[in-house]
């Protein structure tokens, strides 16, 4: 009898870590000469999870650039616009800091999202700012045109197509897509057409604003897999937009009149500063924009409330356009010089030509966006002939080529090898 009792006691197994018997725990898992209970497994999982979260937080902290570093990077590609760049840098830094904060469980303080609105004239750098931010942060980026959007059920793109395009850019990696930056251009073009209700439905104006509302605030969007059409009884890809940073931009033509009317009404009396309307530029007026101005312009109050960071961009003057032509890392002049270098020729753009290009862009009122077309037109014939000539060592672009539609001066590598002396002198005369 004692032998049987002893053998029974010997069969009771214990956890090798906490020493609890198999009767004290729910499950005991055996290994080579060791045992572990379910309680110890849960404890180990908690330890590993906490360490993984700490490592992830440290990685995000080390990868996330400071606002000053973000602005310094933007300075390399975007000329001027100091205040908008500072505002963007702080907003983007706080946004990704908010995402990191959300990963810490147990914190009672919930940080809300600060989406961004960029207001500025055509060609002032709104799109470039958003693209440069995404490139620096190494996050997915997608750009949408608000003018192509319509309410769901009508001909055109609905707002969920933006998320579908984002997923395509991320190869359908949902986790990656949920930390992206989405830039919606021409947001001013979907303003309410009229303050008065109409019997006809505004499917591309206020209707689109209402559709964008939940997307910008944060919702779970259902997107068809692999870009297919929506139909019943199919599985959808679920994308949470809570941590997606939305940047919207627009030229807002006519907003300056709304701001001017408001500010001039308040500037009445003996202490009011009297200034002619022509003295105040569009950029200066935009800097005084208030939410009520945007609502009067035609944006619905709910949408304005979900875009708390409003950055206004200045008009670009001649000096700024000359800087844009030469100073950024990927400036237009450097790009064309690279193209000519591939043909074995040096492109020499004189300072007078740079100013003439800037003046022509200002006259066309296209901002920085119109610079490329001016240079392309001036160099078209040269770029057409250069590959077949092969012995041109230098191309000189001066002021007369831009202002008088002349031809650039071609300098050949070998005077004796020049195909036609009179033709060369004619080219020189045209550029002189």
Curated annotation (Swiss-Prot):
Any one GO biological process: proteolysis involved in protein catabolic process
Gene Ontology CC: one annotated term: HslUV protease complex
Gene Ontology MF terms in the entry: ATP binding; ATP hydrolysis activity; ATP-dependent protein folding chaperone; protein dimerization activity; unfolded protein binding; zinc ion binding
Swiss-Prot/TrEMBL keywords: ATP-binding, Chaperone, Metal-binding, Nucleotide-binding, Zinc
CDD domains: RecA-like_ClpX
Pfam families: AAA_2 (PF07724), ClpB_D2-small (PF10431), zf-C4_ClpX (PF06689)
Ranges of residues in domain ClpX-type ZB: 3-56
Segments forming a coiled coil: none
Signal sequence coordinates: none
Residues holding Zn(2+): 15, 18, 37, 40
Keyword Cell cycle in record: no
Binding site for ATP: 121-128
Family: Belongs to the ClpX chaperone family.
Assembly description: Component of the ClpX-ClpP complex. Forms a hexameric ring that, in the presence of ATP, binds to fourteen ClpP subunits assembled into a disk-like structure with a central cavity, resembling the structure of eukaryotic proteasomes.
Its biological purpose: ATP-dependent specificity component of the Clp protease. It directs the protease to specific substrates. Can perform chaperone functions in the absence of ClpP.
Stated name of the protein: ATP-dependent Clp protease ATP-binding subunit ClpX
């Amino acid at each position: 009898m004692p032998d049987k009792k002893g053998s029974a006691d010997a069969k009771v197994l214990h956890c090798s870590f906490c020493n609890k018997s198999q009767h004290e725990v729910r499950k005991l898992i055996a290994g080579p000469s060791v045992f572990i209970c379910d309680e110890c497994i849960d404890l180990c999982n908690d330890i590993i999870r906490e360490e993984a979260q700490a490592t992830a937080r440290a990685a995000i902290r080390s990868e996330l650039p400071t606002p000053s570093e973000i602005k310094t990077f933007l300075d390399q590609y975007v000329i001027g616009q100091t205040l908008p760049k500072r505002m963007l840098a702080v907003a983007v830094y706080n946004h990704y800091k908010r995402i990191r904060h959300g990963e810490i469980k147990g914190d009672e303080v919930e940080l809300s999202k600060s989406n961004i609105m960029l207001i500025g004239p055509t060609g002032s750098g709104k799109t470039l700012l958003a693209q440069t931010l995404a490139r620096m942060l190494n996050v997915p980026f997608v750009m949408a045109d608000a003018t192509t959007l319509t309410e769901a059920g009508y001909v055109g793109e609905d707002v969920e197509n933006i998320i579908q395009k984002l997923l395509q850019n991320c190869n359908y990696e949902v986790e990656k897509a949920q930390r992206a930056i989405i830039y919606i251009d021409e947001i001013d073009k979907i303003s309410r057409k009229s303050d008065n209700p109409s019997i006809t439905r505004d499917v591309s104006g206020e209707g689109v604003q209402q559709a964008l509302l939940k997307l910008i605030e944060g919702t779970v969007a259902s997107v068809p897999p692999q870009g297919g059409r929506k139909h019943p009884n199919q599985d959808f890809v679920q994308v949470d937009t809570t941590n997606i940073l939305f940047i919207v931009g627009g030229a807002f033509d006519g907003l300056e009149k709304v701001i001017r009317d408001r500010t001039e009404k308040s500037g009445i009396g003996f202490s009011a500063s009297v200034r002619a309307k022509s003295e105040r530029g569009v950029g200066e007026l935009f800097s005084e924009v208030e939410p009520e101005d945007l609502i009067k312009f035609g944006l619905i109050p709910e949408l304005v409330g979900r875009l708390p960071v409003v950055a206004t961009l200045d008009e670009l003057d001649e000096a700024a356009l000359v800087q844009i032509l030469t100073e950024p890392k990927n400036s237009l002049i450097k790009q064309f010089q690279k193209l000519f270098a591939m043909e074995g020729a040096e492109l020499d753009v004189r300072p007078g030509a740079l100013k003439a290009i800037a003046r022509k862009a200002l006259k066309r009122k296209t901002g920085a966006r119109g610079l490329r077309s001016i240079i392309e037109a001036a160099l078209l014939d040269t770029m057409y002939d250069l590959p077949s000539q092969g012995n041109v060592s230098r191309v000189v672009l001066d002021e007369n080529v831009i202002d008088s539609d002349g031809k650039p001066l071609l300098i050949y590598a070998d005077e004796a090898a020049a195909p036609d002396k009179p033709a060369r002198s004619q080219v020189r005369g045209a550029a002189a």
